[in-house]
Amino acid sequence: MLSHNALVVVAAGHQAVLFRNTAKQGIELEEKERLSPKHLQDESQGKQPEETTPKDEDEATFAKQLAERLNRMVLQNKVEALAVVADPSTLGQMRRHYHKTLEQKLVREVAKTLTSASGAEIAKALG
């Protein structure tokens, strides 16, 4: 069960959508914000294998930036409970950057690409 006002993050590659659960019981998602990559020339994901493509590196950088944003939100007490729905690659990259406090607030992870899905489809995946 997802608690009232829980933050739900739906991410894939180069985009993420933040929702809040507005239902007192069950899941009813209200979109709060859409995020896209910041183009930071000096910041990269870190050392990558030689076979990494620029697209892969961009996606890894976005996943890192998203995780850092979520870490800040958690550390500023803006998140009491968190659910993350992301494609497996993005989810794996994000996990590498989770703060310990974020991990404590994390109530659900779903490894699926649902950035184009409706709120009802996302709620079903979280169910």
What are the language-model segments listed below?
Residues 1-127:
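Terminal alpha-helical anchor/extension segments at protein ends
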